[in-house]
Regions:
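Generic structural hydrophobic/aromatic packing signal, biased to beta-strands
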Residues: 17, 37, 54-55
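Extracytoplasmic
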Residues: 1-22, 63
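Membrane-embedded transmembrane helical bundles of large multi-pass transporters/channels
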Residues: 42-235
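A general structural motif
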Residues: 1-2, 33, 69
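Soluble non-transmembrane domains of integral membrane proteins
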Residues: 35-43
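Solvent-exposed, non-transmembrane alpha-helical starts
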Residues: 24-35
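General structural signal for secondary-structure boundaries
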Residues: 10, 25-26, 48
């Protein structure tokens, strides 16, 4: 009884099977493994009256991670919609909305590409980086576009406005990003691997955001020329 009682309950007609695996294996894909186990059990258990349930810390952690992953996707989608509305209210231009969204979303896609290239998995720490990045990117984007619009009013020249904007606000954005990167890089001294990844990837996304706001954003403004109406009004 001492041996069988943890695994078999005759009164409730229940049985428990235990399986051990190395959860720290970097090649382990928990969600794929659990899905495969569920699929195999459905094929093996033909009796419709027989039910089964997977449990343990790995199942709990995987469910929590999948829930967080799905919530992050929905949150990012909602953030893009809200940002579109906010950009339109601030700048009253669909071109500006498109330009600002491209400049904000591109660094996030680039980050996920780097994570895939380096085989860095999504976990509780790394999955929140996108939300942090888009929050900081929006702030820099609004500052640059507003400064660009103010500089454009002087001579109605896109190239000169871009140069003055870089001289005026570019330095502040650059030094702010450097300070943030240095601050988050301290996390790389941690002994916890997810914390190390968080510090490393946050620094990378901050550099991506700075590059997008100082290189991609001005280029998009020069390409799409969103202030042509302002140019015509002043004439």
């Amino acid at each position: 009884d001492l041996i069988l009682s943890p695994y078999i309950n005759i009164e409730k007609n229940e049985a428990r099977s235990t399986m051990r695996l190395i959860d720290s294996n970097p090649d382990l894909r928990r969600n794929i493994l659990l899905t495969k186990i569920n699929t195999d059990l459905r094929e093996i258990i033909k009796n419709k009256e027989t039910t089964y349930r997977l449990s343990n810390l790995m199942v709990l952690y995987n469910n929590m991670l999948q829930s967080l992953f799905n919530s992050q996707i929905s949150t990012l989608g909602a953030s893009i919609v809200i940002l579109s509305i906010m950009f339109f209210i601030l700048f009253r231009s669909f071109k500006i909305v498109f330009i600002a969204l491209v400049a904000n979303v591109t660094p996030i896609f680039l980050l996920f590409g780097i994570m895939g290239w380096l085989n860095i998995p999504l976990d509780i720490m790394t999955i929140t980086i996108a939300a942090i990045a888009i929050g900081i990117a929006v702030d820099d984007t609004i500052h640059f576009i507003h400064r660009f619009e103010e500089e454009f009013k002087f001579d109605k020249d896109y190239v000169n406005a871009m140069r003055r904007s870089h001289r005026g606000i570019g330095h502040a954005m650059y030094y702010t990003t450097i300070i943030i990167v240095i601050g988050f890089s301290i996390l790389m001294l941690s002994n916890l691997v997810p914390t190390i990844y968080f510090g490393l990837l946050t620094g990378i996304i901050m550099i991506n955001v700075l590059a997008a706001d100082l290189l991609l954003l001005p280029k998009l403004l020069l390409m799409f020329k969103p202030y042509e109406k302002l140019k015509e009004i002043t004439k």
